[in-house]
Amino acid sequence: MDSPDDPNKKNDPNPQPGNPPNDLGTFAQQFQHQPVAARVPERIARGVFTTGVLVLDSPNEFVLDFLQGLTRPFQIAARVIVVPAVMEQIVTAAGDNLDKYTQSYGLPPQLPKPPQKRPTIAEIYENFKLSDDLLSGAYSNSVMVGHSPSEFFFDFITGFYPTAAVSARIMTSAHHMPRIVDTLKMAMQQYRNRYNPPPNNG
């Protein structure tokens, strides 16, 4: 279905027909869907806690694996799939929210620096359990980020007709947020360098 972006139109339960039906009875209609709130399914409302994020990318999407390394067995608490344009929004929203937190409460306490020898991707996935129900992840086409004096949250949202809904809710401590923001920014920059390199003026 086509969804023209006319901000002056509202959701219409009886939209005007578009193209007339063809010989097979197939037709298309134009409609407006501008959600102002997102439903939170009961199974999502409690959210999951993360201590870090691992980002994988391809030309078409990003995979955000939120890690839970607090108690054993270590596991991937949530997997979220977004397109590059939404990844840009996530990086901006997370960075802006961390800036607002810092203005209100000061810099979050720093975590110890990780060891110099970084594990490979294969080693990480050997140590962090990924359950079968998370293999395909949860899709998101927008995000909302917020904070309290001690925690941050990410609400990943799908804005599909007829009802926008939260597809994943992630929470983390203020201690972990700077490293998460840095990881997201680094992943976005690496994506740009890999798939949209700057023109070579030489």
Q: Language-model segments: what does each one mean?
A:
Residues 1-202:
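Positively charged, low-complexity terminal tracts
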